[in-house]
């Protein structure tokens, strides 16, 4: 591996802007200046403007946070100022040189992420139509203009006017002969591009025949058109229109990938350049220079925030684990770029559907829920981005020796095999005669012997990495497979993770994760290795220190800890991996543990996918994770009004608030911090009261002496559910004050930042959510001692117990196959590489399991001893259990939805005075709304008093929102209870007597 992968990303990023700035300055900007030359004469300001591109400079903004600290404050934006010298010749003055700020670009790290407002953001790819047309009337004739994107900022313009066609590339007209460069070309290279050769030969035939075709609703001579072009890419684009109208070779839908091109956020950032580098902005800038006005970089800063901070194609980087980080790199926006701030935009259903040409390039399974369903997906693992085109890698051609590359256009021209498999039945191998192929945008069954296809579509070409690591994926419902792939990205890294007994061939580390590892920058020998530092001595006897930083707190308070994989005395080369993240073990994805699971029943606690776990999981710290809470406090200063200071002694003493303040004024207690404990307290020292004149008069009447006003602010305390240990606090001072107000940057600033790190150990608890790799998830309902669990005749107790009904009801059979193979691996101390699709290798699953068993050299009676149908005994009586029992060994993960962060309790009270509803929010110790499922949960736990409180009218939100009441009809909870009683043939009605003479009014629920 090469250690300069991160540097290559950085160089490509900088070179993109440098090249595009040069092209724009040499073509577009100069043409704009010449176009507005008459305007300069009228204004009598400019005479000439000259750009010095060779003196282009990059100026970095001030980094007010530590470069080694991974946790940044919420206002941190790191970017470059790109400046270019301008020589401006005025009419009445001498020439002057100015350093003009043309664009601001964000900084990127070695992983390709940018930092915006203190969080790492990930720019994703998005699709856009490569061809757009505009029609207008000029001199009573219709003129059509077609804009076709070729490369980054290079566009092809085709103008159709009065049976004439004119082709431009940006602003240059094409008039050269096209086929002069192809007369003596012999196509002997076996790595050729199918689409280009097909286009050249096809248009050559058109030239020889000298036929007129009806293109763009106009009759154009092909011979004349060919003589006026010179680029093969242009010829391919024109041939695409010919095929659409004549051959019907491609799909005419605009949603097809043929008509789209992939774009990145670089194009969005470069839009600032076209808006900022205009002659009017330069004139305003020079006007401020002439009249000595104060110049701010506010315009480019506003453009920077407008294009990046609220950009829909820049997402937050999810770094909860390695898989979540990796899947974000494959994101793609199929809908395209939109400036709309409304999330509930309306998109046609045809765009949300899976297109036929997505197969092999875009993952057809993975998509988010909600409004963006079908609009945001992930690229398949084989898809690469080559010159802003999606190309396929893994395609085998029978005429070539090696694998070749084909693009989207060639894919639609040839047949493609979708499931080329071999079945094994009765120990005999035979080939399938009929096979399903993808031809002419349809799936057809053809004879395999007559129609030989030369391209195979593998599973690797259609799924992403989170689906490929799931064994027996195709033995499940597709919805459960999608749920399992998403839950891999929500799994918490554990302290003690394990290798799965059942794995796939895609479970190894991907090449994209190379930037997440700590690599060597030189050749040398390892001198020292420990948990926080690796020392390497190079060939010149220099010592290089690589710090591992055991706990790097990242976005969303997640962290990454590194573990060294080298030893003392080992010789290393450049690019050698020295340390891996904690969720990678031996270069494999290890996010969970092997769970000895018993599919059985346990006094009803396993109902509705609930899980009963063994208490030994807590004692041995299995399924234990670590999390951080970071609290920040800013001390600001206003030169005219106030200054904020820390307070050493508290103004009010509260015996419930434990505190120990040091000489700095912050908490120095290293003990366990509870809810409500004070971390720091600050006061606002008012310097002047001249703004509020009325308050100033009252203050002078009360205090006749010259006294200053001190305002006591709310202290920084531990939030509910954030109990932990204070392991570190930072005091960050800035040599340059951090700006708080954009209008007055020199007055209102922050001069100090206090940051507290609370360390939490999250052990498994009741209410935590566990899941398997097949979408089977459940909540921990009870923690049982080891002596209260059933056991085998060898004294083995399961780690957890769950119900087998949910798996069969959801057609989730892959977990049984995985658990059976994992149980064999536990007993025989081996690991099994399982296929994703069982039917690719064997016809029956039972035969596959028997083949695994027969491959192990054991006695015949071992099958009975190690059978998955264990004979469990009751822990009370010791007799054999008669109900259904099944012992499996699946791989389980711990999800991020922990009970400590979700549970919220309160006493009766704290109702709103207006609506008489419970207050909302954790800060005010509020509660949540109760729905129908919550009422069912209270009924199952026998919470009669809580249900009685919910049955009152004050719990009905809709009743209090409507002020026109037409009689009391009861709360919604009371209606749910009466409907459930009707299911058991108990009818409850309420009768109201308004008067002796009136009839009775009956309310039926």
UniProtKB/Swiss-Prot annotation:
MF terms from GO for this chain are: DNA binding; DNA-directed RNA polymerase activity; ribonucleoside binding
**Broad enzyme group:** transferase
Oligomeric form and interacting partners: In plastids the minimal PEP RNA polymerase catalytic core is composed of four subunits: alpha, beta, beta', and beta''. When a (nuclear-encoded) sigma factor is associated with the core the holoenzyme is formed, which can initiate transcription (Potential).
Q: In which family does this protein belong, per the annotation?
A: Belongs to the RNA polymerase beta chain family.
Q: What organism does the UniProt record list as the source?
A: Theileria parva (East coast fever infection agent)
- Gene3D superfamilies for the chain: 2.40.50.100, 3.90.1100.10, DNA-directed RNA polymerase, subunit 2, domain 6, RNA polymerase alpha subunit dimerisation domain
**One biological process GO term for this chain?**
DNA-templated transcription
Q: Give the location in the cell.
A: Plastid, Apicoplast
- EC number(s): the record gives 2.7.7.6
Q: Name one Pfam family in it.
A: RNA_pol_Rpb2_3
**Annotated InterPro entries:** DNA-dir_RNA_pol_su2, DNA-dir_RNAP_su2_dom, DNA-dir_RNAP_su2_hyb_sf, RNA_pol_bsu_CS, RNA_pol_Rpb2_3
Recorded protein name is: DNA-directed RNA polymerase subunit beta
Catalyses:
RNA(n) + a ribonucleoside 5'-triphosphate = RNA(n+1) + diphosphate
């Amino acid at each position: 591996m090469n250690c300069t992968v991160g540097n290559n990303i950085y160089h490509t990023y900088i070179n993109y802007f440098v090249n595009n700035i040069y092209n724009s300055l040499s073509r577009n900007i100069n043409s704009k200046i010449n176009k507005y030359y008459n305007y300069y004469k009228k204004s009598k300001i400019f005479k000439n403007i000259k750009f010095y591109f060779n003196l282009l400079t990059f100026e970095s903004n001030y980094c007010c946070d530590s470069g080694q600290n991974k946790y940044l404050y919420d206002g941190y934006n790191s970017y470059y100022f790109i400046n270019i010298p301008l020589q401006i010749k005025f009419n009445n003055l001498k020439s002057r040189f100015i350093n003009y700020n043309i664009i601001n670009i964000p900084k990127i790290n070695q992983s390709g992420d940018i930092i915006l407002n203190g969080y790492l953001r990930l720019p994703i790819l998005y699709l856009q139509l490569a061809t757009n047309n505009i029609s207008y009337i000029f001199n009573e004739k219709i003129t059509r203009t077609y804009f076709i994107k070729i490369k980054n900022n290079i566009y092809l313009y085709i103008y159709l006017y009065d049976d004439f066609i004119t082709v431009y590339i940006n602003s240059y007209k094409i008039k050269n002969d096209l086929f002069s460069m192809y007369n003596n070309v012999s196509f002997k290279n076996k790595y050729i591009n199918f689409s280009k050769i097909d286009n050249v030969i096809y248009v050559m035939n058109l030239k020889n025949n000298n036929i007129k075709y009806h293109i763009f609703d106009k009759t154009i001579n092909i011979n004349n058109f060919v003589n006026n072009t010179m680029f093969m890419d242009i010829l391919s684009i024109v041939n695409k229109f010919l095929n659409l109208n004549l051959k019907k070779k491609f799909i005419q839908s605009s949603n097809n990938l043929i008509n789209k091109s992939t774009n990145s956020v670089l194009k969005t950032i470069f839009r600032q350049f076209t808006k900022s580098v205009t002659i009017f902005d330069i004139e305003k800038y020079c006007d401020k220079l002439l009249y000595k006005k104060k110049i701010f970089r506010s315009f480019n800063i506003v453009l920077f925030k407008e294009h990046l901070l609220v950009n829909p194609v820049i997402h937050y980087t999810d770094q909860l684990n390695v898989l979540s980080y990796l899947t974000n790199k494959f994101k793609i926006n199929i809908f395209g770029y939109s400036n709309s701030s409304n999330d509930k935009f309306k998109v046609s259903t045809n765009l949300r559907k899976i297109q036929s040409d997505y197969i092999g390039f875009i993952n057809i399974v993975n998509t988010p829920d909600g409004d963006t369903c079908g609009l945001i997906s992930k690229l398949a693992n084989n898809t690469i981005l080559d010159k802003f085109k999606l190309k396929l890698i893994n395609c085998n051609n029978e005429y070539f020796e090696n694998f070749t590359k084909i693009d989207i256009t060639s894919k639609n021209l040839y047949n493609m095999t979708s499931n080329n498999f071999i079945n094994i039945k009765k120990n005999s191998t035979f080939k399938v005669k009929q096979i399903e192929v993808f031809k002419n945008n349809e799936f057809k069954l053809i004879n395999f012997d007559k129609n030989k296809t030369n391209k195979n579509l593998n599973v690797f070409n259609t799924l992403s990495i989170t689906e490929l690591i799931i064994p027996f994926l195709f033995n499940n419902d597709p919805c459960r497979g999608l749920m399992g792939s998403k839950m891999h990205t929500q799994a918490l890294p554990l302290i003690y993770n394990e290798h799965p007994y059942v794995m796939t061939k895609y479970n190894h580390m991907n090449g994209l994760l190379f930037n997440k590892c700590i690599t060597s920058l030189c050749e040398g020998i390892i001198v020292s290795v420990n948990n926080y530092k690796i020392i390497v001595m190079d060939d010149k006897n220099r010592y290089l220190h690589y710090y591992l930083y055991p706990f790097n707190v990242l976005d969303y308070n997640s962290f990454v800890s590194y573990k060294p994989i080298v030893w003392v005395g080992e010789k290393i080369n450049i690019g050698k991996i020295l340390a891996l993240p904690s969720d990678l073990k031996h270069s494999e994805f290890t996010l969970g543990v092997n769970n000895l699971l018993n599919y059985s029943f346990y006094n009803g606690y396993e109902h509705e996918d609930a899980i009963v776990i063994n208490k030994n999981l807590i004692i041995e710290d299995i399924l234990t994770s670590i999390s951080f809470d970071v609290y920040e406090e800013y001390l600001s200063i206003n030169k005219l009004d106030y200054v904020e200071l820390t307070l050493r002694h508290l103004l009010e003493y509260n015996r419930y608030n434990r505190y120990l303040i040091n000489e700095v004024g912050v908490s120095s207690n290293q003990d366990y911090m509870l809810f409500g404990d004070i971390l720091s307290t600050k006061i606002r020292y008012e310097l002047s009261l001249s703004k509020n004149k009325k308050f100033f008069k009252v203050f002078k009447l009360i205090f006749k002496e010259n006294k200053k006003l001190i305002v006591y602010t709310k202290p920084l305390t531990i939030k509910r559910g954030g109990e932990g240990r204070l392991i570190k606090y930072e005091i960050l001072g800035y040599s340059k004050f951090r700006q708080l107000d954009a209008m007055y940057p020199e007055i209102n600033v922050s001069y100090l930042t206090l940051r507290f790190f609370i360390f939490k150990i999250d052990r498994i608890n009741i209410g935590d959510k566990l899941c398997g790799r097949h979408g089977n998830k459940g909540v921990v309902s009870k923690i049982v001692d080891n002596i209260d669990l059933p056991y085998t005749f060898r004294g083995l107790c399961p780690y957890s117990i769950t119900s087998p009904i949910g798996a069969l009801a959801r057609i989730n059979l892959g977990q049984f196959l995985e658990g059976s193979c994992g149980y064999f691996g536990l007993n025989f101390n081996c690991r099994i590489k399982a296929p994703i699709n069982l039917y690719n290798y064997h016809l029956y699953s039972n035969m596959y399991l028997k083949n695994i068993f027969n491959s192990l050299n054991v006695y015949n009676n071992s099958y009975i001893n190690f059978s998955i149908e264990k004979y469990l005994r009751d822990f009370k009586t010791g007799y054999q259990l008669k109900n259904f029992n099944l012992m499996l060994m699946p791989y389980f993960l711990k999800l991020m939805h922990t009970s400590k962060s979700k549970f919220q309790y309160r006493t009766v009270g704290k109702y709103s005075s207006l609506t008489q509803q419970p207050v909302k929010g954790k800060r005010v110790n509020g509660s949540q709304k109760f729905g129908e499922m919550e009422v069912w949960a209270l009924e199952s736990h026998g919470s009669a008093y809580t249900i009685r409180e919910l049955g009152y009218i004050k719990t009905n939100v809709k009743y209090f929102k409507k002020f026109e009441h037409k009689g009391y009809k009861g709360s919604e909870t009371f209606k749910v209870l009466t409907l459930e009683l009707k299911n058991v043939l108990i009818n409850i009605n309420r009768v109201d007597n308004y008067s002796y003479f009136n009839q009775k009014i009956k309310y039926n629920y």
